[in-house]
Amino acid sequence: MTHKILCPTDGTDHSNIAVAYAAELAAKSGAALSICVVNVAHGGAKGPLIHHWTDAEVVALLDAAVALAGQHGAPDVKRVDIVSREAAAGIVHYAEQNGYDHIVVGTGDKRGISRLMLGSVAADVMARAHCTVTVAR
């Protein structure tokens, strides 16, 4: 049984599909839902870390995803801002450290030979995760 669901978003249509699915799953199962944004950081060795998104952009991404989750029946969605050098590693590490038992990720609608391949973040999360991973598309 699922108790805690983590769903990353980057504001794309593909991640919105994952958010909607995760919200519906949480509503049906009674699981707690957390929506996260992974703010990928670059640099750092001798200089400051440079983040992909500003704090305001992270807040806007989370606000939009939480609103979407609410439209799909998920109450009391937790907001999580993860800073990591790599998106998949940040998602998996946060999920492990905080007791999540299900991760829902989005991936693009691919055609032809590329349909055999998942998006790199989704594939990396599936390969590294300690828990169930659902890929929504």
Positions of the model-derived regions?
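Short, acidic/small-residue loops that bind anionic groups at enzyme active sites
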Residues: R128-R137
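Glycine-rich, Arg-bearing micro-motifs that act as flexible, cationic patches
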Residues: H102-A127
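A short acidic, glycine-rich active-site loop
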Residues: I50-L61
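Small/aliphatic-rich secondary-structure junction motif
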Residues: H3-H52, G70-H72, D76-V77
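Short secondary-structure boundary segments
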Residues: V37-N39, H102, G106-G108, R137
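Conserved acidic residues
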Residues: H3, D101, H130
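Structural beta-alpha unit
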Residues: G70-I103
